Amino acid sequence: MGGEVPEPRRLNRALSFDDWVPDEALHLVMGHVEDPRDREAASRVCRRWHRIDALTRKHVTVAFCYAARPARLRERFPRLESLSLKGKPRAAMYGLIPDDWGAYAAPWIDELAAPLECLKALHLRRMTVTDADIAALVRARGHMLQELKLDKCIGFSTDALRLVARSCRSLRTLFLEECHITDKGGEWLHELAVNNSVLVTLNFYMTELKVAPADLELLAKNCKSLISLKMSECDLSDLISFFQTANALQDFAGGAFYEVGELTKYEKVKFPPRLCFLGLTYMGTNEMPVIFPFSMKLKKLDLQYTFLTTEDHCQIIAKCPNLLILEVRNVIGDRGLEVVGDTCKKLRRLRIERGDDDPGLQEEQGGVSQLGLTAVAVGCRELEYIAAYVSDITNGALESIGTFCKNLYDFRLVLLDRERQVTDLPLDNGVCALLRNCTKLRRFALYLRPGGLSDDGLSYIGQYSGNIQYMLLGNVGESDHGLIRFAVGCTNLQKLELRSCCFSERALSLAVLQMPSLRYIWVQGYRASQTGLDLLLMARPFWNIEFTPPSPESFNHMTEDGEPCVDSHAQVLAYYSLAGRRSDCPQWVIPLHPA
């Protein structure tokens, strides 16, 4: 016995996890796996798991509409209940992508609306959607559609909305924020109020749609479950009856104070008792008291479209200690941010948008600098999201954010060019410290000024951004060498946007080849050639390259070393696609592919 050598342990496939777990159990387990990355990993275990993932997947997000074929999606996930689809590059939001660029919803709706019999929710973002597309969707899915989100879309009219309102009686969410909609009358809202009794969320914020306050009141009477309304401009004094009726309302944005300074006109405005998310338009100093009675209850406050001064911001925010989300313009100033740091200890999201470019106003009100950001970092240590336009910034402020804001998953900073001199450039050490310490970061954007980040700083971003999946960089680096050093470290980066950088087409191509997880890159403003031939160095299977040439005027301008100057017109879009080259490129976009 003592001299016997035990047999080596062998894995018996008959006893493997895959074989003894029945399909029913795997269906249940898969039903609780929601993270798409976990889903993808599970589907690769074996064919059986792949099949069960296909049958149990409830939601899919297609991050770029040209990355997949609608027919393949239908075959792969026949029981989808929810689909999100993104179209044009983010630059479309800033006027850098023309309307006729593409991203048409028609192929997706025509292919999927009828066959996906379980589809209850559709979210389209930055896409061209026509009345005919919406009509096709309503014909196929109107009887069971619960959620329709058209986010920053173009191409449709209120005729289509009227059809949705009349036919989709199970609709719980209708989202139209920042859509360009042809207004053919407000009947759509009346139809919605008459035909729907289950609506929870209605959003037509930042559109130019005109509606009748009486229809909003009727909607509130018939939809007792209405929790969120974000609307276009409408005088707040005309919404008094609506607010009295909408007792369940928790989230309101829009309306307007059309007669700023009229002390008595808005005295009777009383918000519903459960309201805790608020954004008001054109509010001035005299209208602030309308918020004070329930300011302690506010969890979200949006002051981006108000006429408030820095002092007004200080006064309001001091009364809102329970804020989780704050959205303002940079008129809040460093003083306002100091109040935020002292008061809003629970704050999770802070957005500081660009304000008025009038230098006189900025001198009077201040603007945001390293002082304000440092105060927020020290005082609001639960922050998960910061997006800020700043007039000045230092390495020390970025280090403070890295030291105190350990929960950050999304950080975006834009350094404005209105100041002649910035205190502390380059920002290499500050960026390095922020990335090293904020290990939960998944999204990172840094738009600076020339000289804002050296090649060393760019390499730090690559070295310490191992978990970041999306990145936007502008005016960073000094040479092609810096870009290559950056790319070597970006092992998990999936989406990259570059603007106003000094890189050549060859360097861009070599950088792409260094990033193994990259699925999408968009570049605007670089040292472009007239043909884009060096971009073919990044060519590989399933990789589409689309090139917008530089303007002829800029192409004739060369740097001292004979290289093309940075051209703001030239663009590159490259992405993985299982659908092949797209067939709807406009004439001014040139698809590049090896001969």
UniProtKB/Swiss-Prot annotation:
Residues 20-62 form the F-box domain. It comes from the Eukaryota. Keywords: Jasmonic acid signaling pathway, Plant defense, Stress response, Ubl conjugation pathway. The keyword rRNA-binding does not apply. Induction: By the leaffolder Cnaphalocrocis medinalis infestation and methyl jasmonate (MeJA) treatment. Jasmonate binds at R90, R351, Y389, R412, R499. It holds the Pfam family Transp_inhibit. The keyword Ligase does not apply. Coiled coil: none annotated. Expressed in roots, shoots, leaf sheaths and leaf blades. GO terms for cellular component: SCF ubiquitin ligase complex. Plants silencing COI1A and COI1B show increased plant height and seed length, are hypersensitive to gibberellin, and display reduced sensitivity to inhibition of seedling growth by jasmonate. Plants silencing COI1A show early and reduced tillering with few grain filling, and display increased sensitivity to the chewing insect Cnaphalocrocis medinalis. Involved in jasmonate (JA) signaling. Required for jasmonate signaling in plant defense responses. Can complement Arabidopsis coi1-1 mutant and restore jasmonate signaling. Required for JA-regulated defense responses to infestation by the leaffolder Cnaphalocrocis medinalis. May act on an initial response of jasmonate-regulated gene expression toward drought tolerance as part of a BHLH148-TIFY11D/JAZ12-COI1A complex. Component of SCF(COI1) E3 ubiquitin ligase complexes, which may mediate the ubiquitination and subsequent proteasomal degradation of target proteins, including TIFY/JAZ family. PANTHER family: F-BOX/TPR REPEAT PROTEIN POF3, S-PHASE KINASE-ASSOCIATED PROTEIN 2, ISOFORM A. Interacts with TIFY6A/JAZ3, TIFY6B/JAZ4 and TIFY11D/JAZ12 in a coronatine-dependent manner. Interacts with TIFY9/JAZ5, TIFY10A/JAZ6, TIFY10B/JAZ7 and TIFY11C/JAZ11 in a coronatine-dependent manner. Interacts with TIFY11A/JAZ9 in a coronatine-dependent manner. This is Coronatine-insensitive protein homolog 1a. It comes from Oryza sativa subsp. japonica (Rice). The lineage of its organism: Eukaryota, Viridiplantae, Streptophyta, Embryophyta, Tracheophyta.
